[in-house]
Amino acid sequence: MSYGSIARGGGLGSRGPFGGPSRQGCQPLECARCWTEYGIRHFPCPSPESKLQNRCVGKDGEGDLGPAGTPIVPRARKRGPGVAPEGSRMPEPTSSPTIGPRKDSAAGPHGRMAGPSTTRAKKRKPNFCPQETEVLVSKVSKHHQLLFGTGLLKAEPTRRYRVWSRILQAVNALGYCRRDVVDLKHKWRDLRAVVRRKLGDLRKAAHGPSPGSGKPQALALTPVEQVVAKTFSCQALPSEGFSLEPPRATQVDPCNLQELFQEMSANVFRINSSVTSLERSLQSLGTPSDTQELRDSLHTAQQETNKTIAASASSVKQMAELLRSSCPQERLQQERPQLDRLKTQLSDAIQCYGVVQKKIAEKSRALLPMAQRGSKQSPQAPFAELADDEKVFNGSDNMWQGQEQALLPDITEEDLEAIRLREEAILQMESNLLDVNQIIKDLASMVSEQGEAVDSIEASLEAASSHAEAARQLLAGASRHQLQRHKIKCCFLSAGVTALLVIIIIIATSVRK
């Protein structure tokens, strides 16, 4: 049934004898069209003879219609079905017309949301559960030097991203919530802030609790927070059992420079020994003796060597500070050749260590494809590995899908687990890699700064010696001047005594006569 039949039958679009809207219908024809096309309900509707724009129901003029119900503003107030407009004496129909597209609850005149829930708020992710926090802390603390290292231990952004991706995969494997890398970084930052605040409170409580402070037992760190505290340089308290000692180089007294040289020589020897051990273990990779214990020993040796290199770099910095401080010139001339020799030995050892690390990483990567391919692989290459010119249509595309599905059962769960373990081992090896070039540059900059400090000390000593010579000359002149004054005083004193004696003799002789 069309709207024309409704209008002719005195229904929805019927009109009275004076051209106005009829009370037999709910709304005029134009009103039904407005509702169907624009989702607007209003009463009365302008007559077709009127060319003026009549005001319709809306807020602040919204919902105005031009001739024949044409909208002239972007939006109009939405009213649901069955709601009578204000000021109308006749109820509106509870059902909308069945002709034309319906946009009553979806969009306004221009396709925008017109209902009360126009914008849907972004759903907030749930907080980290204890299991997710434990996995995050264990993984991040394990690769902390690679993720947050600076200076000598700073890694490339791509390598850090791979490590974060691996940590994200481990956290999402728990199945509690779908996280991303940003969530992990924010959670780690919040954990560090909480631990830093607790460490400060514990330190204040150790020095002496204030009268208004709470109990120190309430500030005790949890095991997870203790692991986070170990990533700080030296913020933990000794009473908690997880205090971190600062590098030994920062605790050396300026008078014990020779002890610092001996420590650096021992570190160079340890690095060379680690290089020899790693080369021996490198030959066993890919052989029947390649076991998990061998991989663990490689990882442990590289971690210890990285710590030794960091301690050696701290020793170089400490020696530069000691040489920059007060030091006799004779001792400075004696210690400088020894420092240059140790610096050269350390640079050579670090370069050899970097070469061995690269070899280990390359060989580990080369072993991963061997584990993936194996003996179960079909001689036919899957469709995804074929070149574009080889993907010739032959019958239908289902043939290629069938070939790929035929290849998938060849890879078992054990193979996937082995691949995952090897990938973790490769990632672990890459996390142990150090930027050798950056280390050499840092050592060169340290030595150059040290040379500048030594030169400045020599210049200061020369200036001090020249000033001392000038002071000596001034003192000699002052002594000569003082001697002359003493001589003059002696002369005047002797002359006075002589004159006094003469006067006494004259007086004595005159008295006798």
From Swiss-Prot:
What GO MF annotations does this protein's record show? SNAP receptor activity; SNARE binding
- Looking at the UniProt entry, the stretches that span the membrane are 491-511
Q: Mind listing the UniProt keywords for this protein, alphabetically?
A: Coiled coil, Membrane, Phosphoprotein, Transmembrane, Transmembrane helix
Q: Which domain of life is it from?
A: Eukaryota
Q: Which residues form the t-SNARE coiled-coil homology domain?
A: 416-478
Q: Name one Pfam family in it.
A: SNARE
Which subcellular locations apply to this protein? Membrane
> Compositional bias of type Gly residues: which residue ranges?
7-19
Q: How does it sit in the membrane?
A: Single-pass membrane protein
What SUPFAM superfamilies does the database record attribute to this sequence? t-snare proteins
Question: What's the name of the protein?
Answer: t-SNARE domain-containing protein 1
List the top taxonomic levels of the source.
Eukaryota, Metazoa, Chordata, Craniata, Vertebrata
